[in-house]
Amino acid sequence: MSSVFETLKERGYIAQLTHEEKIKELLEKEKITFYIGFDPTADSLHVGHFLQMMVMAHMQKAGHRPIALIGGGTAMVGDPTGRTDMRKMMTREEIKHNADCFKKQLSKFIEFGEGKAIMVDNADWLLDLNYIEFLRDIGVHFSVNRMLTAECFKSRLERGLSFIEFNYMLMQSYDFLKLYKEYGCIMQLGGDDQWSNILGGIDLIRRKEGKEVYGMTFTLLTTSEGKKMGKTEKGALWLDANKTSPYEFYQYWRNIHDADVIKCLKLLTFVPMEEIEEYAKLKDQEINIAKKRLAFEVTKLIHGEEEALNAQKTAEALFEKGASTDNMPTTEVASGELSNGINIIDLLLKTKLIPSKGEGRRLIEQGGISVNDVRVEGFDRLVTMDDFNNGELIIKKGKKTYHRVKLV
């Protein structure tokens, strides 16, 4: 059985390491505590966090203890990494709510509890810091000249970097020191854009404690063209079903570029490498087999097997010839009726899915009506020709009632 280090390397997670041979030895022979930071600026994790969650899962399965650090304190300041502007400040209540949402989502990948994964919030120690003591004990170890060469600051210098954001590296470094002293945490993991901040923490612990600790960054999730993955027309691809439906989530992965399928199977699923190597041999239309497997596996990880199966069935019913739409109740609509669009409530009445307009409004208010598995958000939703795939669309009422609308 290969070590977790070999697994991470073989599947393509690792971007940079501070001490490759030592880290390899540690992960193979010892059980370590490591941490990954999460920025609580939204009430859901998104695809950008997916890869980090997979790394935590691989590490915990190998016997290592994860710490999920919620940046409640640093979120009140703002990480300049990858940003060209300053962001709004958050309240403690907002941060607490978001952290609770994160823990629920992370629990699908790692196990929390006694002797297992833990979640901490750096607001618990950062908000109580004495500024003079912090400058004297921590700030003294940082060279401004060296900090200014870090990638995370370079892009902001011309546009302007506030002093409050300039402190971010010091605070993240202090987090590592705090977790080292309190939990024996000896490794920080993060996206490759966090490399400078990770090195800052390693250097601080070496200077303050005289101890060697380690850092590892992983590949950022990008397409073969170098663009960030997880962006849709509606914005980020969220892991919360209320923000991105399981069907939309499934379809995103089902429709990714051929060149990205194998990479995503390695990084975002637990499909064994031997199987992935077989998928890599597929050509042309056969690649769709690998895409379906990818879409199913990632949706199962985030939303559970039942939702993944539902999304798969809906996609097949909508887009694959000879699929089960033939057996659905069907209403035929003349294309002329759609020249200016047809109101969703009028269409529901036409299909006899509702007895009255009032019932239609009630269902829409409760989120109970979907068109092609995308929830209808307002009473004024117009159904147009653009909603039809191969001359048909599917309306879903509640969880189990499907109805086909067919163009004639």
Curated annotation (Swiss-Prot):
Coiled coil, from the record: none
CDD domains noted in UniProt: S4, TyrRS_core
GO molecular function: ATP binding; RNA binding; tyrosine-tRNA ligase activity
PROSITE patterns registered for this protein in UniProt: AA_TRNA_LIGASE_I, S4
An example Gene Ontology biological process: tyrosyl-tRNA aminoacylation
Motif annotated as 'HIGH' region, chain positions: 40-49
Entry similarity comment: Belongs to the class-I aminoacyl-tRNA synthetase family. TyrS type 1 subfamily.
Function statement: Catalyzes the attachment of tyrosine to tRNA(Tyr) in a two-step reaction: tyrosine is first activated by ATP to form Tyr-AMP and then transferred to the acceptor end of tRNA(Tyr).
Name the UniProt record assigns to this protein: Tyrosine--tRNA ligase
Name of the gene: tyrS
